[in-house]
């Protein structure tokens, strides 16, 4: 669950205030048109959530209790069941559970290429799904599991971003010819060490400052934007001044009790750790660390290049949430707002378009079957995934390298990822669950391939940690623009686009 809605326009503020905040945090590489259309809907979707049954904390005057000017406090441990119930109650919506969608179907519509459906397979049963659609909305989230995570072995999925978000939405869009943006702005979360629990609740809830092992407050030294907070922590550790902490020692009993409750709602392992150690945050500062990098549009603007209506560069294909690029700092309400925009735009689209000439799903069915017909391969999907994460960690700016990368290392990463992609073709699946894992690795490897080209292309360090280029350690105004990508004839092609000022529509 979550304990706050982090995107809300409180009294005394207007949507454009949020645009400016996100623009500053993203060092200018954002889409103001997308941000504004989201911010205009934040409060509306917040009220929708409350009507669904979400408990939003209120003061004695019946006003929402805010945490800063853009956050609203909630009791959000049940937010996902509430949303799932809302979807399942709709008469005209059919939900297919335990189905893995792998590819988009392409056809010709009104004389140009268009997405006309999707294909996938059942995870439990040997079933192929061939779905026709007048329009498709991708809302699959971003990509986790590209880099070696903080914790090894059994605990490797104790991570910030859901391990089930494999980048599949990015991958199927790329294969369909859709343009992506800003993958080079990776997201690294500042978290409580080992539990990977959120730190914002402590920093904002009790005003805890970031301190090094000597007790020195260092956050003002490096800056307080999202990447700067992590950059400071990495630098202090690199200089031998770690471990680093959030200074909670000395907080009141009431504040400690509130932290126990808050973490039980969203990250129980943190509260359990305090109890197990016999010392809570009042007695001991909370150690912090950065996670491995993720590709997540809701935080760092990486994802599909969309117009103001959230349509991608391929006709009939829309994107919303973490998979959609251009608009960082979305959080829950931003994702819901974007879903609303994409849904309404898709409805308008299907009313206007003409006859479809579509392609068969037969080729994908044959591809699924091929993995069952392979002889037992020398590598398993798990071997390939582990090798991929090691490559990205060591050669594409992971935790091991302090998030830094250079062109020489990226060259190695490019070659090794290509070799691993070839290995995936030969993987053997013993059942449908195995096939699912093979496809998850396939999606991640394609996202890695595209990410590496983005890291090559931005020859500057615009965002510390998120894009820490050791060859080009300074910000360069020559890169005041978007770095986009698409796949042309099987190869990643980089596209440089100028910054968008007002309303944007696709023209090429």
Region roles according to the model:
Residues 21-43, 69-70:
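Dinucleotide-binding Rossmann-like beta1-alpha1 core, especially the glycine-rich loop
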Residues 138-197, 332-345:
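Glycine-rich loop(s) and the adjacent beta-strand/alpha-helix scaffold that form part
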Residues 351-432:
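Long, amphipathic alpha-helical stalk/connector segments used for oligomerization, subunit docking
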Residues 43, 50-105, 114, 182-331, ...:
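Mobile, glycine/GP-rich and aromatic-enriched active-site lid/loop segments adjacent to catalytic centers
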Residues 1-21, 200-202:
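Conserved N-terminal glycine-rich FAD pyrophosphate-binding loop of Rossmann-like flavoproteins
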Residues 133-135, 139-140, 320-321, 454:
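Short, well-ordered coil/turn residues at beta-beta hairpins
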């Amino acid at each position: 669950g979550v304990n706050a809605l982090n995107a809300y326009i409180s009294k005394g503020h207007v949507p454009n205030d949020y645009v400016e905040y996100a623009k500053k945090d993203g060092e200018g590489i954002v889409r103001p048109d997308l941000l504004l259309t989201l911010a205009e809907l934040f409060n509306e979707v917040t009220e929708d959530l409350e009507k669904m049954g979400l408990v939003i904390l209120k003061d004695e005057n019946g006003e929402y209790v805010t945490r800063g000017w853009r956050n609203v406090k909630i009791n959000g441990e049940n937010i996902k069941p509430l949303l799932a119930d809302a979807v399942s109650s709709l008469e005209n919506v059919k939900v297919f559970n335990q189905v893995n969608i792998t590819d988009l179907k392409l056809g010709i519509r009104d004389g140009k290429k268009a997405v006309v459906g999707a294909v996938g397979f059942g995870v439990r049963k040997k079933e192929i799904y061939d779905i026709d659609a007048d329009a498709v909305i991708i809302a699959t989230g971003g990509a986790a599991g590209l880099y070696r995570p903080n914790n090894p072995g059994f605990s490797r999925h104790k991570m910030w971003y859901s391990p089930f978000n494999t980048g599949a939405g990015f991958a199927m869009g790329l294969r369909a010819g859709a343009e992506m943006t800003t993958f080079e702005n990776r997201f690294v979360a500042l978290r409580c060490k080992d539990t990977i629990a959120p730190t914002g609740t402590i920093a904002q809830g009790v005003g805890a400052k970031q301190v090094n092992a000597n007790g020195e407050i260092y956050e003002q030294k490096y800056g307080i934007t999202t990447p700067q907070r992590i950059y400071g922590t990495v630098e202090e550790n690199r200089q031998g001044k770690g471990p680093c902490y959030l200074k909670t020692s000395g907080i009141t009993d009431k504040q400690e009790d509130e932290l126990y409750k808050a973490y039980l709602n969203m990250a129980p392992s943190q509260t359990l750790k305090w109890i197990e150690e016999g010392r809570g945050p009042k007695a001991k500062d909370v150690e912090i660390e950065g996670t491995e990098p993720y590709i997540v549009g809701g935080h760092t603007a990486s994802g599909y290049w969309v117009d103001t209506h959230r349509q991608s560069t391929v006709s009939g294909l829309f994107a919303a949430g973490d998979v959609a690029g251009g608009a960082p700092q979305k959080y829950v309400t931003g994702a819901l707002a974007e879903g609303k925009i994409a849904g309404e735009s898709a409805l308008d689209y299907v009313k206007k378009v003409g006859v479809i000439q579509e392609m068969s799903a037969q080729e994908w069915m044959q591809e699924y079957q091929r993995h069952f017909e392979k002889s037992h391969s020398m590598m398993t999907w798990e071997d390939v995934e582990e090798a991929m994460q090691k490559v990205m960690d060591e050669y594409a700016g992971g935790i091991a390298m302090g998030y830094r990368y250079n062109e020489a290392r990226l060259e190695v990463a490019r070659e090794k990822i290509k070799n691993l992609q070839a290995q995936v073709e030969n993987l053997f699946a013993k059942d449908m669950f195995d096939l699912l894992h093979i496809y998850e690795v396939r999606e991640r490897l394609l996202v890695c391939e595209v990410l590496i080209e983005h890291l090559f292309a931005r020859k500057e360090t615009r965002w510390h940690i998120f894009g820490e280029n050791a060859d080009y350690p300074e910000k360069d105004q020559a890169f005041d623009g978007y770095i986009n990508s698409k796949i042309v004839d099987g190869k990643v092609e980089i596209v440089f686009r100028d910054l968008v000022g007002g309303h944007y529509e696709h023209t090429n």
